[in-house]
Amino acid sequence: MVTSSKGQIEELLATILQHSTAEDEEVLLHLLNGIHDKQQGIHRRYINAALHMVGNFEPDSSEVRIPITPVIHNTIKVPHGGIIATIADAAMGGLASRSVPAGFNVVTTNINVSYIATTTNKELIARGRFVHKGRQTLVMECDIEDETGRKLAIATASFFVIQRRQS
């Protein structure tokens, strides 16, 4: 019995690769590349690394993109609704957190997603913007599309301003 994490990982990877399908290997490579990107400082959070999330934030708008791969598929092989909610939260929350004064951050207090369509295309794109900027509460909205411009969902969310925790 191997007791180190590295040994357990090596054994598990060997077992997985012995029985892997091409899709298993695609997913594993995707996830390992995400961890590698985090180690290289490209991502700060594992969720962003695992999803290969890329964001662009302007003062009043944001755009977050993730590739559509089997990692995010549901049982009918389209992006899972929870992933669509996650990318919307990242676009809105990332924009909200950048708008508050130094020493503060935001937490999501409510999110609502209305799903409109599915896609089998290559990329999810979430575009966030402000509806209301208060001292303690921010209200945001977001459109989620694929790379062809097909609207997949719309989301709204509320964020509460909190003092940033000391690391």
At which residue positions do the language-model features occur?
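Terminal targeting signals and extreme-terminal segments of soluble enzymes
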Residues: 1-125, 131-167
